[in-house]
């Protein structure tokens, strides 16, 4: 039978529940236990697909086309296990399902209430993942902070779940903050005590406490927390701040988190194999050199908006023994001041995805800069569409070329709506979403980057596509369409053979990169930057860059 581990958070938001859940998944998988992870989000949106990146960060897309929280990206990268739409649940999706049942008459005229109807729906979603994925352990992260009104139905549901599946099959882990007060010169346990008190008032007694802190917990502090929170002292786990999120599983392993989970759930204690993970973290901490790659976007004020792109660059860099420092470039600044001041000396340039016309001209200018100056370039989704517009305007002779998204009246819509999107009105969940095949053209850069493949599978999230009416003109002017849908109808990849490394994709390769298995396109970009003789590269051999992920861990 599947065992269930619930991960809650207290004191503050963004405390790192998602990283703790993903790290526990990694530790259990290293012991040959199968794992799946479910995120319960308390917001009323049905999914994050229509939310602003500034509000929510990146929207992570699964193989089956679900638009989900960025934590699912952490789950996939840490456990190397594909998630599905079942692994992401929001308050909005719960209420939508319950109201649909009410409209159909499923409740036979009964009064629909939070308890039992909403809580039962939440429990059913948890059981659905366990039934479909059949993992040895299902980890469930509850978004938000204990004490928030939005989380109450989820907390009540997981309280009831203990009775449904039996006490031996369930474990509650609470992630909390243990702040150091410099003026007092000591660590304070009171926030943790109050957070546990709040959780107990709901009827949940945590079995394990994971304490976020900036220094190790002393034995005295652990004893105090154990006494006041009624948790075994060995189940008070230190989660000290780390230079990289990938170091967190090793910290939690050293603290004995996995051993405590297995002990509580009466599962066999197995020896972990973390050899590859340890090598990954060692390489992260000891790069031979650092290169700087410019990421040109319009959401750069919030790096989480491009989280999977940043992580994919890091995976590719580690595999080649180096580090990558991101130069965050706001495309609107390029529009105002030109590309030279922002892109000079960058080893490479990435233009990632996005929506809307704001900042697009800056992205196009950055792409022209990369093309003219032979700087290695990778375009993703909107980045490919901007590359198409740039070529059309400056090489193919279509000076007014544009995307129908930005100018529906343009005479030369080199980017146009997909045929199946013509009559779509709703924005949420209606794009081309999920995993689709892409056929590679032989003897191209794309085919060299995927050397063993003729058909590759990548994840999509877009409504607009290359307009085939202009394909002959592009081919005649030197463009190469190196990847298409298997029927040849949809353009998925373009490249410039006259350039050292210029390739762009309609899909999102960043969603399939893994720490120990970097995506070929990102590996190719980093390799091209290293191969550059230094004309564009900015190397710092003696002083490594700051870690790519130095922000507080996302919840």
From Swiss-Prot:
PROSITE patterns: GATASE_TYPE_1
Family matches, as NCBIfam families: PRK05380.1, PyrG
Annotated signal peptide: none
Alphabetized InterPro entries for the sequence: Class_I_gatase-like (IPR029062), CTP_synthase (IPR004468), CTP_synthase_N (IPR017456), GATASE (IPR017926), GATase1_CTP_Synthase (IPR033828), P-loop_NTPase (IPR027417)
Pathway info: Pyrimidine metabolism; CTP biosynthesis via de novo pathway; CTP from UDP: step 2/2
Amino acids binding Mg(2+): 71, 141
UniProt keyword annotations, A-Z: ATP-binding, Glutamine amidotransferase, Ligase, Magnesium, Metal-binding, Nucleotide-binding, Pyrimidine biosynthesis
GO cellular component, one term: cytosol
Activity control: Allosterically activated by GTP, when glutamine is the substrate; GTP has no effect on the reaction when ammonia is the substrate. The allosteric effector GTP functions by stabilizing the protein conformation that binds the tetrahedral intermediate(s) formed during glutamine hydrolysis. Inhibited by the product CTP, via allosteric rather than competitive inhibition.
Region (Disordered): 536-555
Role played: Catalyzes the ATP-dependent amination of UTP to CTP with either L-glutamine or ammonia as the source of nitrogen. Regulates intracellular CTP levels through interactions with the four ribonucleotide triphosphates.
Family assignment from sequence similarity: Belongs to the CTP synthase family.
Annotated active site: 381, 508, 510
Note: CTPSs have evolved a hybrid strategy for distinguishing between UTP and CTP. The overlapping regions of the product feedback inhibitory and substrate sites recognize a common feature in both compounds, the triphosphate moiety. To differentiate isosteric substrate and product pyrimidine rings, an additional pocket far from the expected kinase/ligase catalytic site, specifically recognizes the cytosine and ribose portions of the product inhibitor.
Molecular function per GO: ATP binding; CTP synthase activity; glutaminase activity; identical protein binding; metal ion binding
EC main group: ligase
The keyword GTP-binding is annotated on this UniProt entry: no
Protein residues bound to L-glutamine: 354, 382-385, 405, 463
Tree of life domain: Bacteria
Entry EC number(s): 6.3.4.2
UniProt-recorded name of the protein: CTP synthase
Binding annotation for CTP: 13, 148-150, 188-193, 224
Subunit structure: Homotetramer.
Binding annotation for UTP: 13, 188-193, 224
Segments for region (Amidoligase domain): 1-267
Gene3D superfamilies hit by this protein: 3.40.50.880, P-loop containing nucleotide triphosphate hydrolases (3.40.50.300)
């Amino acid at each position: 039978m599947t065992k269930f581990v619930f991960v809650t958070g207290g004191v503050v938001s963004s405390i790192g529940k998602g990283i703790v859940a993903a790290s526990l998944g990694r530790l259990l998988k290293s012991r040959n236990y199968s794992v799946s992870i479910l995120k319960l989000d308390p917001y009323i949106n049905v999914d994050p697909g229509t939310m602003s990146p500034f509000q929510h960060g990146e929207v992570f897309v699964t193989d089956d086309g679900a638009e989900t929280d960025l934590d699912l990206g952490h789950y996939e990268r840490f456990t190397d296990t594909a998630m599905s739409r079942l692994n992401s649940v929001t308050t909005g999706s719960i209420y939508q399902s319950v109201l649909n049942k009410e409209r159909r008459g499923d409740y036979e005229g009964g009064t629909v209430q939070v308890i039992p109807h909403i809580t039962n729906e939440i429990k059913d979603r948890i059981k659905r993942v366990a039934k479909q994925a059949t993992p040895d352990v299902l980890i469930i992260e509850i978004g938000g902070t204990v004490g928030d009104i939005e989380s109450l139905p989820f907390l009540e549901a997981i309280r009831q779940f203990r009775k449904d599946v039996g006490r031996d099959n369930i474990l509650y882990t609470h992630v909390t903050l243990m702040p150091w007060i410099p003026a007092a010169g000591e660590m304070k346990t009171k926030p943790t005590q109050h957070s546990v008190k709040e959780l107990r008032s709901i009827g949940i007694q945590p079995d394990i406490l994971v304490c976020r802190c900036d220094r190790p917990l002393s034995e005295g502090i652990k004893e105090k927390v154990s006494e006041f929170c009624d948790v075994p002292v060995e189940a008070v786990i230190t989660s000290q701040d780390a230079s990289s999120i990938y170091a967190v599983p090793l910290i939690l392993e050293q603290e004995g988190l996995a051993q405590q989970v297995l002990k509580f759930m009466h599962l066999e204690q197995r020896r972990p194999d973390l050899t590859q993970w340890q090598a990954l973290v060692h390489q992260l901490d000891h790069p031979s050199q650092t290169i700087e790659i410019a990421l040109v976007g319009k959401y750069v004020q919030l790096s989480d908006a491009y989280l999977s792109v940043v992580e994919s660059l890091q995976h590719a860099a580690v595999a080649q023994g180096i580090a990558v420092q991101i130069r965050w470039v706001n495309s609107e600044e390029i529009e105002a001041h030109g590309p030279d001041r922002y892109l000079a000396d960058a080893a490479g340039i990435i233009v990632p995805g996005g929506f809307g016309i704001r900042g697009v001209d800056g992205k196009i200018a950055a792409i022209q800069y990369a093309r003219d100056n032979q700087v290695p370039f990778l375009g993703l989704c909107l980045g490919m569409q901007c590359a198409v517009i740039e070529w059309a305007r400056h090489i193919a002779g279509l000076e007014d070329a544009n995307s129908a998204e930005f100018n529906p009246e343009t005479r030369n819509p080199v980017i146009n709506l997909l045929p199946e999107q013509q009559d779509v009105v709703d924005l949420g969940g209606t794009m081309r979403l999920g995993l689709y095949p892409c056929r590679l053209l032989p003897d191209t850069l794309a085919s060299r980057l995927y050397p063993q493949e003729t058909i590759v599978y990548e994840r999509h999230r877009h409504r607009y596509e290359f307009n085939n009416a202009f394909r002959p003109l592009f081919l005649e002017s030197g463009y190469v369409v190196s990847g298409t849908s298997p029927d040849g109808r949809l353009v998925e990849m373009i490249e410039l053979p006259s350039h050292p490394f210029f390739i762009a994709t309609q899909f999102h390769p960043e969603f399939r990169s893994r720490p120990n298995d970097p995506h070929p396109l990102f590996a190719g970009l980093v390799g091209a930057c290293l191969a550059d003789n230094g004309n564009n590269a900015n190397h710092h051999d003696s002083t490594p860059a700051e870690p790519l992920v130095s922000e507080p861990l996302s919840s």
